[in-house]
Amino acid sequence: MCLAFLAFTILCVMVTPLLARTKIVHRWVLTDQPMPKFRKILIIAVLENYLIRQEFEDEMERLLARSNIEGIRSHMVLPPRNEMMERELKQRIKEAGYDAVLVIRPKAFRKETEEVGTKTIYMPPIAYQSFWPYWDMAFKQFSAKGSYLKENTIVSAEFNLYRTNDETLLWSGETDTVYSENFGKLAKEYASTLVKQLRKDKVL
């Protein structure tokens, strides 16, 4: 019993840092017409941080390939926003034959305080033969618990998927993400969250 309890405690400690730091808070899917079959989607992350943009678009390309969809990274095919007019962008999208365009952009930032637990020391039951040993154990099962407050930066972003031939909005929503300076991990987790939801909503 002691070994099983210890294994469970270790598992909890190992899994906690892996919990998702990106969550979808709102989403909408077009339902009054069939969802088209996608072959080629242009991914545009409207971000000032080029490293996050590149990591995110690269990961989206990799994940979409699992669904036999070619994800096109905007940082590889489009110049900076301030160097392209809307008419030119439309022409490029039309000529390239994209089925859809997925646009992601941050909307707002806010601070939130999170209570982070340090550790809990467990003392599993030893004896149940008589009342007083059990009574003593019951009050010592949790002998110590510590925590501290951590301030996080929450990035609110929106995502919109448009069909290119008629500019119809097919899929839309908002996310909250705990900002991290580990840009690679941040971008990959965000991409994974979006693709999982795309599949769940039967968009892909």
Residue ranges of predicted features:
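C-terminal/domain-edge helix-coil "capping" segments
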Residues: 20-40, 48-51, 66, 135-204
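Helix-enriched interaction subdomains in cytosolic or periplasmic regions
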Residues: 12-21
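Surface-exposed short loop/turn segments
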Residues: 85-161
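Flexible domain-boundary/linker segments
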Residues: 77, 110, 118-121, 176, ...
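N-terminal segment of the mature soluble domain
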Residues: 40, 44-117
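Bacterial N-terminal signal peptides
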Residues: 2-13
